[in-house]
Amino acid sequence: MVKGEKRSEMMLNLFGDNSEEEEIESEHECNRRQPNYASDEAEGGVEPEGEGEAEVEVHGEAEAESDGEQGDVELDPGESEGEREQSSQEADPQEESEARDSDSDNKEEEHGGRVAKKRRQEVVESGSERSGEKHYESEDEEVDQTRSPRSPSEEKEEVQVAQSDVNIRNVFGSSDDEDAEEYVRNDVEQDEHRSPIEDEEGSEKDLRPDDMVLDDIIPEEDPQYESEAEHVEARYRERPVGPPLEVEVPFRPPPGDPVKMNMIKVSNIMGIDPKPFDAKTFVEEDTFMTDEPGAKNRIRLDNNIVRHRFVKSRDGKTYSESNARFVRWSDGSLQLLIGNEVLNITEQDAKEDQNHLFIKHEKGILQSQGRILKKMRFTPSSLTSNSHRLLTAIVESRQKKAFKVKNCVTDIDPEREKEKREKAESQNLKASTKLSQAREKIKRKYPLPVERRQLSTGYLEDALDEDDEDYRSNRGYEEDLEAEAQRERRILNAKKSHKGIPGRSSMTSARPSRRQMEYSESEREESEYETEEEEEEKSPARGRGKDSEDEYEEDAEEDEEERGKSNRYSDEDEEEEEVAGGRAEKDHRGSGRKRKGIESDEEESPPRKAPTHRRKAVIDDSDED
């Protein structure tokens, strides 16, 4: 206490104005940071000349006392710098209170204070020249010794920083002393740029160190290379602290053990109904598959849809009941039974997919139910199952053939081929028309005789008409046939009796040759217009015609011979019979031609001559036939 009173008296004598108190505080801080300077001043320093010697000596004693106090503080070499600063800060508030009480006395000693101020500046300069062994680590430390005056609140902050430095030292050990010193210096620099309002806010923030981030407390290693923007960002970042949020979320327990949860993909062979089953409102679902032509194929999915319903037990508890269940067999295989349908299950590992199950609540809140680690795949159990038949129906509907336009490339021009075919058809048509015209022309020129007529509708109709004739006509025809047969027999008998006559035989042989030549020429003309079939049909008929003509000629010759040998009366009778037979045949032929509407050439034949020319008349008839 004695030392404190002496010190206060000396300060009152030395400092008269309040403005000089700030200089005293800065000087004390310099003395605390540089104790060597104070020891040099205690030894005597430089003695001034002229007036003011007593005042200078008093100042030297005061400095000696302050040095003595500092020497007491420095007796413990193991004490840290933070503790020394703390002790010096505790003495400063007492000095400030005593200085404020003696404001009235300070006015009288203004002149002495000014002289002491000049002396102190000289002492500081001399001390800095003598301290050649100590060097500053950075320019920031030199600036700290000559910083501007500070308010009491700033000094309190320094005390708090020193305390936090001690706490950090106790936590991290003595090896972090350098980092702590840098932290104190950076804190002082930041405080210089802050306003009093920011200082008050900073004091309130210092009371809650738990809200600060550890990365912001520890400064960077090289603060001298920091820019202004980085220096501003180095301020303390606070965690956002506000009123607690109150959200009401219904708690839903997870559906099961996460190890047993699996993810499945619903395919076309099975389905899941998310709505609970109700027999009153249940409606069967029908699925329609549309193929390419647009037809709809109805496919029912009633037997392989998983459904559930809520049932109450006897205790009154509600639980869910499903129509599906899993079955694991002794061999390790797993199957799903949906009613009467059986599906095989294959399991796959899905750890790499990172699948999680969440329940979505209101206001964007998700409740996790667990992680899904496996996948399941369903396949039909057999070829006779309903699911397999469903799959086959879908495949057939998709692969059904549709009518499409097919493109093909050919080397042949279809237009030219069509023209060639049309031309060939037209040529065939022309040839057929020409052939039909030629046949009609031949038929008109050479009509067929009655004997040569073939079976046809007209011929058969004529035969029916002949059946309708009366019995007399048939009887006359039979009589004519009998007469002709008798005539042939007589002719044969006559030939046998007259074989020995040579002249007659030569004449008869010459005449048929002439007739054959005539018929050959006519046949040549007919061959040019008739087909082979007509030639085949006509050739035997001509042969028969020739035979008949030869017979008529022979008959005529034989008749002449017989007339020469027999009586004229008998000959005339025979000739009359022959003429009557020929007339009957001609009448019969004419009647047949009239029924068919064919004009005969015999009607236009010239009139008959006298009986002396009977042979010639017979020959003319054969030629006409």
Swiss-Prot record:
Its main location: nucleus. The keyword Coiled coil applies. One of its GO terms (biological process) is flower development. Residues 97-113, 121-137, 182-197, 415-425, 471-491, 538-547 have a biased composition (Basic and acidic residues). This is Protein LEO1 homolog. It comes from the Eukaryota. Expressed in roots, shoot apices, stems, cauline leaves, inflorescence apices and flowers. The modification Phosphoserine is found at residues 203, 548, 570, 600, 605, 622. Disruption phenotype: Early flowering, defects in floral morphology in whorls 1-3, but fully fertile flowers. Reduced seed dormancy and increased germination rate of freshly harvested seeds. Component of the PAF1 complex (PAF1C) which is involved in histone modifications such as methylation on histone H3 'Lys-4' (H3K4me3). Involved in regulation of flowering time. Required for the expression of the flowering repressor and MADS box gene FLC. Involved in the control of seed dormancy and germination. Pfam families: Leo1. One of its GO terms (cellular component) is Cdc73/Paf1 complex. Keywords: Coiled coil, Flowering, Nucleus, Phosphoprotein, Transcription, Transcription regulation. Component of the nuclear PAF1 complex (PAF1C), which consists of VIP2/ELF7/PAF1, VIP3/SKI8/WDR61, VIP4/LEO1, VIP5/RTF1, VIP6/ELF8/CTR9 and CDC73. Interacts with VIP3 and VIP6. InterPro entries: Leo1 (IPR007149). Residues 1-214, 415-625 are annotated as: Disordered. Residues 426-436 have a biased composition (Polar residues). Residues 415-539 form a coiled coil. The lineage of its organism: Eukaryota, Viridiplantae, Streptophyta, Embryophyta, Tracheophyta. It is found in: Nucleus. Residues 40-55, 63-80, 523-537, 548-561 have a biased composition (Acidic residues). Belongs to the LEO1 family. It comes from Arabidopsis thaliana (Mouse-ear cress). Residues 492-501 have a biased composition (Basic residues).
